[in-house]
């Protein structure tokens, strides 16, 4: 995974998330939408063949937090949810 910043302002960030597709892009978008400081978030895959694993994101916040902080928090939430799934799976496997 590689992040390439396209445009950065105080309350807006546009970036490519190279190496990912709709699966992770949808997850990240949904988790960002849970943040009350995120006013807009969307992604697009500009060309389905040449850019299939390089979604372009736009994140806009209310200015109380930066888009970078919103992304950090979303990444933590995704990690914690994945850990919960792993823990639940380990309980099932052990029983």
Curated annotation (Swiss-Prot):
Gene3D superfamilies assigned to the protein according to its UniProt record, in alphabetical order: RNA polymerase, RBP11-like subunit
Function: DNA-dependent RNA polymerase (RNAP) catalyzes the transcription of DNA into RNA using the four ribonucleoside triphosphates as substrates.
UniProt-listed GO biological process terms: DNA-templated transcription
UniProt source species: Pyrococcus horikoshii (strain ATCC 700860 / DSM 12428 / JCM 9974 / NBRC 100139 / OT-3)
Domain of life (superkingdom): Archaea
UniProt family annotation: Belongs to the archaeal Rpo11/eukaryotic RPB11/RPC19 RNA polymerase subunit family.
UniProt-recorded Gene Ontology molecular function terms: DNA binding; DNA-directed RNA polymerase activity; protein dimerization activity
Major subcellular location class: cytoplasm
Matches recorded under HAMAP family: RNApol_arch_Rpo11 (MF_00261)
Record's protein name: DNA-directed RNA polymerase subunit Rpo11
PANTHER family, sorted: DNA-DIRECTED RNA POLYMERASE I,II,III (PTHR13946), DNA-DIRECTED RNA POLYMERASES I AND III SUBUNIT RPAC2 (PTHR13946:SF28)
Catalytic activity entry: RNA(n) + a ribonucleoside 5'-triphosphate = RNA(n+1) + diphosphate
EC number: 2.7.7.6
Keyword tags: Cytoplasm, DNA-directed RNA polymerase, Nucleotidyltransferase, Transcription, Transferase
Subunit-level organization: Part of the RNA polymerase complex.
InterPro entries linked to this entry: RBP11-like, RBP11-like_dimer, RNA_pol_Rpb11_13-16kDa_CS, Rpo11-like
């Amino acid at each position: 995974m590689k992040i390439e910043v396209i445009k950065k302002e105080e309350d807006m960030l546009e970036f490519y998330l190279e190496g990912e597709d709709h699966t992770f892009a949808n997850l990240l978008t949904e988790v960002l939408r849970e943040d009350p400081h995120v006013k807009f978030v969307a992604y697009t895959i500009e060309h389905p063949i040449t850019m299939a694993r390089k979604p372009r994101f736009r994140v806009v916040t209310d200015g109380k937090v930066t888009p970078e902080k919103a992304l950090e928090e979303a990444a933590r939430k995704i990690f914690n949810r994945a850990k919960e799934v792993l823990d639940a799976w380990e309980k099932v496997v052990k029983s």
